[in-house]
A protein has these predicted regions:
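C-terminal transmembrane helical hairpin of 12-TM major facilitator-type secondary transporters
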Residues: 10, 34-40, 46-105
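Loop-to-transmembrane helix entry/capping segments in MFS-fold secondary transporters
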Residues: 26-27, 112-122
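Extracytoplasmic gate region of multi-pass secondary transporters
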Residues: 1-47, 99, 133
Length: 184
């Protein structure tokens, strides 16, 4: 979830400046952000539905690897308003689509009794990733005059997240039985 925060907040905050630096108008950037928001609704709903039918670890791995592929394609193609709009639409579908399967995996593994607290811890990692995506984006831009390094870090983190989700066991963890007569 750290990676989700890093990727989406880096893009949400720094993409407008990236586009401006590459000669595109603010209108392209605002349209891109609007498309991300629009397609996010579709992607998040679809991820929740797919997570009820397929293993969530594969769904999460797919989302993270597709984000990395989308970024690589975006960086590898000529930057035009239409390439930005296509990228924004694809990223929108993938934007917060990690939320339903991530929370579902937490509930499956740990149960729902402490779901609010556990979801809070998971969300904290998202926020730490968000901070680092924004901060590192600005820091490296100031140091190099380019966002290239951070884009590639986002790609690498997406591949890493895809790989570490694959071995996740989605069943409840084994807990020792309570001793007889112990208060619940």
């Amino acid at each position: 979830y750290f990676v989700c925060g890093f990727q989406v907040v880096f893009i949400g905050v720094h993409m407008p400046s990236y586009l401006k630096d590459n000669g595109l108008t603010p209108n392209v950037a605002t349209t891109a952000l609007a498309l991300i928001g629009l397609f996010n609704v579709i992607g998040t709903y679809a991820a929740g539905s797919l997570g009820q039918r397929f293993p969530k670890r594969y769904l999460l791995s797919g989302i993270y690897i597709l984000r990395s592929v989308a970024i690589v394609v975006f960086l590898s193609t000529p930057l035009t308003p239409w390439s930005v709009y296509i990228f924004a639409s694809v990223m929108g579908v993938l934007w917060l689509s990690t939320v339903p399967p991530t929370n579902a995996v937490v509930a499956q593994i740990f149960g729902v009794q402490y779901m609010s607290m556990l979801a809070g811890f998971v969300f904290l990692s998202h926020q730490v990733g968000s901070f680092l995506g924004v901060w590192l984006g600005g820091k490296l831009y100031d140091a190099t005059g380019s966002y290239d390094i951070v884009w590639w870090i986002a790609v690498a983190l997406g591949v890493f997240a895809a790989l570490i989700n694959l071995p996740v066991r989605e069943g409840a963890i084994a807990r020792p039985a309570s001793p007889a007569g112990a208060a619940a």
